[in-house]
Amino acid sequence: MTTQLTHLQQLEAESIHIIREVVAEFDNPVMLYSIGKDSAVMLHLARKAFYPAPPPFPLLHVDTTWKFRDMIEFRGRMAKESGMELLVHVNEEGVKRGVSPFTHGSALYTDVMKTEGLKQALDRYKFDAAFGGARRDEEKSRAKERIFSFRSANHRWDPKNQRPELWSLYNTRIKPGESIRVFPLSNWTELDIWQYIHLEEIPIVPLYYAAVRPVVERDGMLIMVDDDRLELKPGEKVEHKSVRFRTLGCYPLTGAVESEADTLPEIIQEMLLTRTSERQGRLIDHDQAGSMEKKKQEGYF
């Protein structure tokens, strides 16, 4: 008797196959852990792929020093629970220069603290493959990227030089110094992610659930006041609203949405009615036309 897999089971099986393929083919893989919902699902899949042993690779978090406090607390808890080594890398040169989203703008800040920080970490530990939680439905440049995304020795991505991926066969050959970025969640949608989190009871950062939080309206977005480093501009005032986050990043660059959805079923119901991208709340995606693709070509994930 043939068992018919559900949609989520098919996605799960594909992702686990990809994760195992990387471990079989590469010498020194790593999983980028950004602490968001996609990272939570990816970590869960990795643990399933190698259960009862822990995944045979470490977690890497590129810390910009501007993450939400709830994210940092959650990061430590999940690393301990998974039994995996957690590597945290900070671009100390950027810290010494005082680079921040307020003083240097989102584009330069992202380049220094995220892109350069990531490249430093990959070079330092000599990783030849790095898992990421990006999905094709998030953004147009990610929509055309392969699951196994080739990067040069300078960590650059050339969208015109991508490898064919037919019948779940992946070309993993690289020269010394080159690497591959791997996206096991490429074919998942935001709704798939939420339904899987609900089905598997995967822990996520509390910021995804609606709650009354201090926010300030800035450039058409609701920015949460997470610590005293957020300086108010003339005319701005802190308000307390029921909000949640569809996507998580650095708190000064991540907009909240007004919502009353404080349970997973309510979030899923809200998702069914939403017609905008989750990354609409990420300021770094609006720096310039083709912003994300330019960042990826320079080494961003």
From Swiss-Prot:
Transmembrane segments: none annotated. Its EC number is 2.7.7.4. Keywords: ATP-binding, Nucleotide-binding, Nucleotidyltransferase, Transferase. This is Sulfate adenylyltransferase subunit 2. Pathway: Sulfur metabolism; hydrogen sulfide biosynthesis; sulfite from sulfate: step 1/3. GO terms for biological process: hydrogen sulfide biosynthetic process; sulfate assimilation. InterPro entries: PAPS_reduct_dom, Rossmann-like_a/b/a_fold, SO4_adenylTrfase_ssu, Sulfate_adenylyltrnsfr_sub2. Disulfide bonds: none annotated. It comes from the Bacteria. It catalyses: sulfate + ATP + H(+) = adenosine 5'-phosphosulfate + diphosphate. It comes from Geobacter sp. (strain M21). With CysN forms the ATP sulfurylase (ATPS) that catalyzes the adenylation of sulfate producing adenosine 5'-phosphosulfate (APS) and diphosphate, the first enzymatic step in sulfur assimilation pathway. APS synthesis involves the formation of a high-energy phosphoric-sulfuric acid anhydride bond driven by GTP hydrolysis by CysN coupled to ATP hydrolysis by CysD. One of its GO terms (molecular function) is sulfate adenylyltransferase (ATP) activity. Heterodimer composed of CysD, the smaller subunit, and CysN. It is an enzyme of class 2 (transferase). Belongs to the PAPS reductase family. CysD subfamily. HAMAP family: Sulf_adenylyltr_sub2.
